[in-house]
Every structure is written in C-alpha cells, then in structure tokens.
Amino acid sequence: MSSRTLVGLRSTTSTHLQRSGVAAAAAVSSSSTSSSGSAPRRCLSSASGRQVQQSAEFSSSSKSWDRLGRRAKEKLLDREFFLSLLNSASTKREAKSYLARLKAQHQGTPPLKPAAKQPGVAEAAAPVSSGASSTSFYGASRSVYDSPVFRHDSTPTPPLQDVSERLHLALVKITTPQLLDDSTVNGVAKTLSQLNRLGMACCVVVDPGTAGDSNQLRRIAAEQADRISTAVDAQPDSKSAHIDSVLSVSALNPEAPKVLSRKLLLGPLRDGHIVVLAPIAYTEDVPRAVTVSASDAILALTKELAGLATNPDPDEDPIRTAQRIAGLQEEVSLDRVILLDPLGGIPAFSGPQTSHVFINMEQEFDDIENELLRVWQSAASAKNNLPEEGLPSIADSNPLSKFADTEVVPVPPSQKAYSSDLTLGTSMVEGHINNLRLSQAALAMLPSASSSIITSPLEVANSAQSPGGASPDVSAVGTRRQRNPLIHNLLTDKPLLSSSLPLSRRAALNGRRDSIATQPSHTTFVKRGMPLTIIPNPWLSPWTAKDRPRLGLDDPSIDLPRLVHLIEDSFNRKLDVQDYLNRVNGRLAGLIIAGEYEGGAILTWELPPGVEDDGSEASQARMVPYLDKFAVLKRSQGAGGVADIVFNAMVRSCFPNGVCWRSRKDNPVNKWYFERSQGTWKLSDMNWTMFWTTPGLTEDSQKFRDYEAVCRSIQPSWADDTGVVD
C-alpha cells in the first residue's frame, strides 16, 4: 500500500487521502489486521503550513515519541487511523457493503476535460472535482483520472463540463460542551477528523444548554465553538473554520432561523475544513446578534442542505423550480445527523431491553414518545409538580409532532417514579424527548438513506483512544479497543449492537432498571425507516393456535407477486408457488411485511406427523409455532436494519412465547440465528439445524419432540428441484 508523496501540492494531498481511505476499506474487505510496515506516508498541506502533529493518545512528554523521526511518526499515525477503521468494520461483508456504497456514488460519472491523445492511447473518462474536499475519497484521485490507458480503438472526447463532486455531510450537535473535560473534547475532535478523512464532511453546532440568560449563553457558545475549533486544529492534517453570520432571523418569526448564505457555509466544507457554528443568528431589520435554540439551528441547516429552504417565485415555471431544487439537492448529501449529548442514547422502559439501539421512526416513534412522556409524567406527579395545564413546553416544541394534553396516556396507579432524584430525572427525560423529536423532524426532510445517531461525547471520545491510553509502540500488542460508534456507523450503516440481539448477549449493563440517573444508554441509531405491516394485527387479536385465522397467501390484502419475488430474490431460487400455497394455506398464523416488501416472514401453525387436526384442545396444544420463510431482498441485506425489524416483530409481538425454525447446517446466516435463538439442535441424518426462542423448551420433552418432528417433516416447495437439500 505504498504511494509516492509530493509535499506541498493540494491535489496530491487529496490523492493520498483518497487512496489511503480506499486502501483502509479494502484492507477490511480482505480481513487484513496488519498495518505496520505497510501504511502509506502522510502528506502535509502547504495551505495550512501545519507540521505533522501527534494524535490525542500520544503523550507530548513521551520519550519514545520524541525519538521518532518524521516519517516514523507519519506511519504510526496512519497505523492508528487504519486500526480504527479495521476495528470499526469487523466483517468482510460490512466492508464490501461500504465499498459498494462508494461505488454507487460514481455510476454514470460524466465527462472530463479534452486532452491530446497519442495513437493507441486514450484518457480515462471520469470527471475531476474542482471543489472537492481535500480529504474526500468518494471520487478517485486526479492522477487516476489523468492516467493514460491502453486502448485499441479511439475514445470520443466528451465536451468539457464543470462538474462538482457531491459533498457528503454530517451535521453534528454537541450539547453542553462546557461540561466536558479537555480529554473528551479532544477525543471528539479526533473522531470528527477521521470522519472528514473518510469523506464525510462535518458541520458542528454548539449547544450551550438553557442554564443562563441570553448574554451568558451567547458568550458560552462562542467560547466553546473556539475550544472545539482549537481541538480540531490540533489533530493531524485537520483544519477547522469557526464561522459567524451563517444564520438570520426575521422579526415576524424570531423562533425560526434560516441560513443567510449557502456559499459561506459550503465553501469551507468543500475545502476540507470542519465547520464549527455557535447558535447565534442576526436579525434582518437591524443587525443584532441573538441566541437561538441549537435544535432550531440544526433544523434550519437541515432544511437548507436538503434544498427545501428555497422560496419559489409564484410566476416561475414549476418545472424550472423543480430543476433548481433538484440541483441544490445534487450539491450536498446530508447523510448523518449526529447528536452528541451527555445523556447518551434513548432509554427504554418497557420490554427486556434497557435502551433503544435502533429506532425505526415509521414504526416506533409514537410508542417511544408516549413511553417517555409517561415516565416524565410519573416522575413529575410523584413530586406533586405536574402543571395544571398539562405537559410543559417539551410537548409542543416540535411542530412536526404535536402532542396535545388530552393525548397523554394516564399513568397506571401501579407505575412508580423512575428516578429517585426527580428534578434530575424530569430534566433528563426532557432531554431524551427533545433528542428523539429533533431526529424525527430532521429525518423527515431528508432521503430515506439518511440517518441519525444519538450518543454521548464520552463514548465517542473513549473509543477514539488507544486501550489503556498509553503511547502505542510499533510492535505493541494490546487489548482490542472499543468500537467508535460514528466510524462504525459510517462504514456499516448499522448500529453498534443489533436491536434483535437478546439482552443476555449484549454487553453487560450496570445500573438499576428503575433509575434514569444510573441507567446506561447505548448509542441509538435512528432511521426514518419503513412501515411494518403485520397480518393479522397481534395487538387486536393475539396469535394463538385456538384463534388462528382462516387466512391464505392469496388473500386480497397480500400482494402475492411481490411476496414471491421477495422469497425468490432472498433465497436465489424459484418457488413452486402453487405447491407452496397448497401447503401453507389453512396453516397460516400470520405474515410480517417490512416496507414495500423489502423483508418479511411467513409464520404457520404446524402439527407433528401423526397428530390429527380435529380442532380439539389436545390437537391445538400440540401445534408448533413455526417460522416457514424469513426473507430479505438482497439489496437490503446487511444494512438498513430490515432483518432486525422483522425478527423483533416476530419474537416480541407475534410469538412472544417462542417460535422455532430450521436452517441448512452450512447456511452462512446461521451465525445470525445462533445469536438470537434460545437454543439449537442439529438434526441427525439430515442437513438441518433446528432453532427456537421458546424459553425452557428442553425441559419439556414432549414439546421438544414435537418441534423436532415438525422440522424433520416439512417438505420444501422449490421449483428448481436440483436434488440439493434445502
């Protein structure tokens, strides 16, 4: 992975960073874990005049560091960067998925500049971004584009066009940074620098909180913006830009700031700077600085960057208006909205989990919001401090999710307060509600591929440090570092922990269940997501063998052609549709569909061979809840949380008392099944492994034999009878 380094050329710096980024991702794809001796040299940008600096985990007084030469320091810093990437994407599948997303950015790349060609030699047809960030590797480097390629036939030269590379951006809100120590701020700055190097430009908004008057908050915000900017500048090959005068407010609507200058904001981002903003806006009539809500600033920036802030002229042709908005959206892709809050991710107070590691907004927003509101109401009621007019301003702060007083679900008498420190507890719940609503409001303006991450600055900073905080030696072997939630999410588009993992298989959690103050919250990954359809509705009628529906897959409420396509695409086999319908119709327990048939599960009630289905209680007691088909479209596998959404619906809503299924012994998905099942059993003389989520199954010998008999007896319904055991 060696490359030539030309110091002082900005384009060469971009070339090196692009190559090093792709090399890092490729290293993950090949499962390489060695980085010493193969890391490329780091380039210095003459524009900043900055010397190579040591990263946050190196001690400035370290004698071993001082003895290293410049090139050795460069290699050591690059090794640290690559190790962070290798640790964040732990599987080849995750790395390949990331590389595929990068490749998709350049399908249909346009034209290049005209150039004279020698006979038999043609130029590589690809554009060079004139305004690309010097740290982006979403596009190939200039030297790659300008390299001649051997070609027998001549290649027509496309016309010259000025094509700018699309800017990929993360919008970051850091809450109360004045309460963070320097080590945490430096760790956050290091992660932002790594994101920038990976091609994800960062725009940071400082949130000073609400403790203090307007003048105090404005002073704190400006000081903390300078502090974060200084921490970013201290990172190797990293530059910041603390920008004022980006936001403005009108006298008619002082609570709705808007972006004053799009160019002022995007210019430094395209130049590779990490932009830092304070939530300060200027009035339009008489220029005067006023403090605005950091959440309102985030929404204003989101609206502008999503291309939705334009005010079309009523006389303008609608087609031209649409083209202008589309052009703005092509300039920038706001991929992430990151909320760094000391509170951490969104906690959970129902079910076995203690925090939400993944939220599908389309499906879960209302339920989670109601749950948090009940917790707030319970804590406030216990302190006899519930306002007579209903909930406080948090219930009305988000115009996209109004929650009237009458909609608040009454607190059951048996429900106790969730925190011993009720003043602290209510304020913390308000913070979680605001984070949830801010994520929902921002994602509502963005494409479905965008996402939000809610985590704590401490978790990001800790994962940015080397294990033990010691200065790493070139040949040192140490403890595996904690995965960085932001880097991991960029590479995998997934949360650190799968939401469908049983609690027993997650990292050990400390703290009491009924205390917000002591309850640790994992990082929460939020997607606008997809709707979830369950037929029949388990909340109206629980799925039981006695009340099983008279439902078939050819029911009008089911789109059978799309369901068949989902199964065939997922299994990569043709289904004998009529044979399959004959087998499952009459046994169907229900159907789970995620989104527009992007994923799904078909569940049935099965009887062991020899047991007659006569409708008796004895027959119903022997029925086995069975997962007949679990399918996810290939394009949705490995990312987006589709499988987790379907699996969670199955085990939490449809069959909370347990379900079983079977899989080929050599199925690569079995590892995923192993992690989510209560137990497994390899069927002798067959190529099947049985899985179940039923608690205590092995203690009930009759039920266990029924499960095994069902998994042995079901015949596949594939049209391509290749003789291969399914």
Swiss-Prot record:
Q: Which reactions fall under this protein's catalytic activity?
A: L-glutamate + acetyl-CoA = N-acetyl-L-glutamate + CoA + H(+)
Mention any Pfam family matching this sequence.
NAT
Pathway the protein contributes to = Amino-acid biosynthesis; L-arginine biosynthesis; N(2)-acetyl-L-ornithine from L-glutamate: step 1/4
Looking at the record, the residues that make up the N-acetyltransferase domain are: 547-716
Q: Which InterPro entries match?
A: GlcNAc_Synth_fun (IPR011190), Vertebrate-like_GNAT_dom (IPR006855)
Q: Does the keyword Metal-binding apply?
A: no
What keywords are assigned to this protein?
Acyltransferase, Amino-acid biosynthesis, Mitochondrion, Transferase, Transit peptide
Ranges of Polar residues composition bias in the record:
1-18, 45-58
The residue ranges flagged as biased composition, category Low complexity, are 20-39
Q: Where in the cell is it found?
A: Mitochondrion
**Which EC class, in a word?**
transferase
Renumbered to this chain, region (Disordered) spans 1-64
Q: Which residues form a coiled coil?
A: none
Q: Which GO terms describe its cellular component?
A: mitochondrial matrix
Main location class? mitochondrion
Q: Where is the transit peptide?
A: 1-44
Cited Gene3D superfamilies: 3.40.630.30
Q: What is its EC number?
A: 2.3.1.1
* Biological process (GO), any one: L-arginine biosynthetic process
Give an example GO molecular function. Answer: L-glutamate N-acetyltransferase activity
List where the protein spans the membrane. Answer: none
Give the protein's biological function.
N-acetylglutamate synthase involved in arginine biosynthesis.
By sequence similarity, the record places it as follows: Belongs to the acetyltransferase family.
Know the name of this protein? Amino-acid acetyltransferase, mitochondrial
Organism for this UniProt entry:
Aspergillus niger (strain ATCC MYA-4892 / CBS 513.88 / FGSC A1513)
